[in-house]
From Swiss-Prot, chain A:
This is ATP synthase F(0) complex subunit a. It is a multi-pass membrane protein. InterPro entries: ATP_synth_F0_asu, ATP_synth_F0_asu_AS, ATP_synth_F0_asu_bact/mt, F0_ATP_A_sf. Component of the ATP synthase complex composed at least of ATP5F1A/subunit alpha, ATP5F1B/subunit beta, ATP5MC1/subunit c (homooctomer), MT-ATP6/subunit a, MT-ATP8/subunit 8, ATP5ME/subunit e, ATP5MF/subunit f, ATP5MG/subunit g, ATP5MK/subunit k, ATP5MJ/subunit j, ATP5F1C/subunit gamma, ATP5F1D/subunit delta, ATP5F1E/subunit epsilon, ATP5PF/subunit F6, ATP5PB/subunit b, ATP5PD/subunit d, ATP5PO/subunit OSCP.
């Protein structure tokens, strides 16, 4: 029985092509290349406005070395937010519910920030392990705790997976379990579903944002 | 100039007669480059007609998304056809939640 509740997260194959392949290439179509015109069409103008604002906000706390990461972080944000929002359409598949994808994004990027920090400024990078002003007896414990917290940072990917999976699962449970069970109070369940969908829209956007924000934070410390 | 003496592979689809469809398909370019070229062609035509216009509305993107939903439905049809809603009006429901009634495979 447990398998039937998680079935929505399996990517079905049709003519040998898994749906996840289609779902992953769709964001590519939705962001057209701006042409060399003075005024582009409305879609590109809106997207360009959003990208500019987002990149400006993101790069405020980073010093000049971190600005090299602008393209990567912005494209990551666009990718994640598009994937999450597209997953809210009926019958679609959300690739970010797969842990493999999220860890594949989180671990290399986190490791890159650590290695850059260790390579360029090893003293400062190691210095982050001990906050200023700690009482002397606490130092050994705190170093252990900070090291553990450094290594647990790839949980960035787990966070994204868990949030999206939980949201989709709630909606699926409400739809398949609650709705058929209690037809007399179906209107309440419909309201619950509607609210859950609104929540999911918010979560989709927030999660993408948090992912990128935390990554930029890790970068900020290390660059 | 729309007489029937064109070389077959170069006619547009609308000009091909029904009986010639098989040989027309055979002459089209199915190499990877050809497939990519036709995808790019189709994308450019859709884009320039519906999105890259002076006052494009939400329709251009919305059609694309609806098409994507339909495509996903088609992809998942085998899997979705196994789900049945609760069929019984019986109030004496067993306490284990045997809600989703899977068809025998």
């Amino acid at each position: 029985m447990t398998l039937s509740f998680f079935d929505q997260f399996m990517s079905p194959t049709y003519l040998g092509i898994p749906l996840i392949a289609v779902a992953l290439t769709l964001p590519w179509i939705l962001f057209p290349t701006p042409s060399a015109r003075w005024l582009n069409n409305r879609l590109i103008t809106l997207q360009g406005w959003f990208i500019n604002r987002f990149t400006q906000q993101l790069l405020l706390p980073l010093n000049l070395g971190g600005h090299k990461w602008a393209a990567l972080l912005t494209s990551l944000m666009l990718f994640l937010i598009t994937l999450n929002m597209l997953g809210l359409l009926p019958y679609t598949f959300t690739p970010t519910t797969q842990l493999s994808l999220n860890m594949g994004l989180a671990v290399p990027l986190w490791l890159a920030t650590v290695i850059i920090g260790m390579r360029n400024q090893p003293t400062a990078a190691l210095g982050h392990l001990l906050p200023e002003g700690t009482p002397v007896p606490l130092i050994p414990v705190l170093i252990i705790i900070e090291t553990i917290s450094l290594f647990i940072r790839p949980a960035l990917g787990v966070r994204l997976t868990a949030n999206l999976t939980a949201g989709h699962q709630l909606i699926a449970t409400a739809a398949f379990v609650l709705l058929p069970m209690m037809p007399t109070v179906a209107i309440l369940t419909s309201i619950v579903l509607f609210l859950l969908t609104l929540l999911e829209i918010a979560v989709a956007m927030i999660q993408a944002y948090v992912f990128v924000l935390l990554l930029s934070l890790y970068l900020q410390e290390n660059v | 100039e729309r007489d029937g003496r064109f070389p077959l592979g170069e006619k547009r689809l609308m000009d091909v007669k029904l009986g010639e469809l098989g040989s027309w398909l055979g002459k089209r370019d199915f190499t990877p480059n050809g497939v990519l070229a036709s995808i790019r062609n189709g994308h450019d035509r859709y884009y320039n007609k519906y999105i890259n216009v002076k006052k494009g509305g939400i329709g251009g993107v919305a059609m694309l998304l609806v098409g994507y939903v339909a495509l996903s439905y088609m992809w998942e049809y085998d899997h979705l056809s196994e789900y049945r809603l609760w069929e019984y009006d019986d109030l004496r429901v067993p306490t284990t939640y045997s809600i989703i009634h899977l068809k025998a495979l």
